[in-house]
Amino acid sequence: MPPLPGAELVHNPLQLYRYLLRCCKLLPTESLQHYYRHSVKQSFRVHADEDDPERIQQIIKRAIEDADWVLNKYKKES
């Protein structure tokens, strides 16, 4: 399961934030979109002070994997 198109272009936290918000629009219901949009925003705030480049890349990689998993989960259910 490759990540969504555009995932390879994510190199910094702001690009990740925008990518994840676009992924939320692909979820099937408005309530799911709202839930995951809120989750993305909260996670961005929590990690806003992160300054270690290696840790930032680790967070980006994990967030893309998690977004792919969530989208595949709801794609199979609907």
From Swiss-Prot:
Pfam families according to UniProt: Complex1_LYR
Stretch forming the signal peptide: none
Species annotation: Xenopus tropicalis
Family: Belongs to the complex I LYR family. LYRM9 subfamily.
Protein's name according to its UniProt entry: LYR motif-containing protein 9
Highest taxon, organism lineage: Eukaryota
